[in-house]
From Swiss-Prot:
The lineage of its organism: Archaea, Methanobacteriati, Methanobacteriota, Methanomada group, Methanococci. It catalyses: L-fuculose 1-phosphate = (S)-lactaldehyde + dihydroxyacetone phosphate. The active site is at E68 (proton donor/acceptor). Zn(2+) binds at E68, H87, H89, H147. GO terms for molecular function: L-fuculose-phosphate aldolase activity; zinc ion binding. InterPro entries: Aldolase_class_II_sugar_metab (IPR050197), Aldolase_II/adducin_N (IPR001303), Aldolase_II/adducin_N_sf (IPR036409), Fuculose-P_aldolase (IPR053406). The gene is fucA. It comes from Methanococcus maripaludis (strain C5 / ATCC BAA-1333). Belongs to the aldolase class II family. AraD/FucA subfamily. Involved in the biosynthesis of the coenzyme F420 which requires phospholactate produced via the aldol cleavage of L-fuculose 1-phosphate and the NAD(+)-dependent oxidation of (S)-lactaldehyde. Catalyzes the reversible cleavage of L-fuculose 1-phosphate (Fuc1P) to yield dihydroxyacetone phosphate (DHAP) and S-lactaldehyde. This is L-fuculose phosphate aldolase.
Length: 181
């Protein structure tokens, strides 16, 4: 399988500071296989050879996947139309989540790509509770309390664009909150 676009998206996430250090993780589904970033990896420096592979039941076929593997698996198992997941710790979305503030969809892009945001309470990273609560969301753009965001798509480009738009509206909400009355 050609993973060049997968790697390109990982690098974009890092270059645009939606992830820092070893934070965040990305996966794509191809039939019964999940291609996912490895644990402890820095997305900006990943190569195709680094990508881990698991089947839809969670059997690891290659590498040591991210600790959030269960979350990715549960989403794919519950949402057949989803083929890509992006999880970041983007700064503005995470700040709003820590303050329990909801975001307003302020732009046409947000109305088109995001439509509605789900909010999930805090659960420990990598926990089954986090996986179950995120996978139960109907929405494809999910803000995790004190933890970041998860965006879902039919492909990795769609999931990435949702990440980009969600972080932009968080920034706009911040600006408007500080310029407004």
């Amino acid at each position: 399988m050609n993973l060049s676009n997968f790697i390109k998206i990982c690098h974009l996430l890092y270059d645009r500071k939606y992830v820092v250090g070893s934070g965040g993780n990305v996966s794509i589904k191809n039939k019964n296989l999940i291609y996912i970033t490895p644990t402890g990896s820095i997305l900006g420096f990943l190569n195709e050879e680094d990508i881990c592979v698991a089947d839809i039941e969670g059997n690891i076929l290659k590498g040591k996947p991210t600790s959030e593997l269960n979350m990715h698996l549960k989403i794919y198992q519950n949402k057949e139309s989803i083929n890509a997941i992006v999880h970041t710790h983007s700064m503005y979305c995470t700040a709003f989540s820590a303050l329990d503030k909801k975001l307003e969809l302020l732009t046409p892009e947000a109305e088109i790509f995001i439509k509605k945001i789900a909010y999930v309470d805090y659960f420990p990273c990598g926990s089954l509770e986090l996986a179950e609560n995120v996978s139960a969301c109907v929405e494809d753009s999910i803000i995790l309390k004190n933890h970041g965001i998860v965006t879902l798509g039919k492909d990795i480009t769609e999931a990435y664009v949702k990440t980009e738009v969600l972080e932009e509206i968080a920034q706009l909400n911040y600006i408007m909150n500080n310029l407004g009355e």
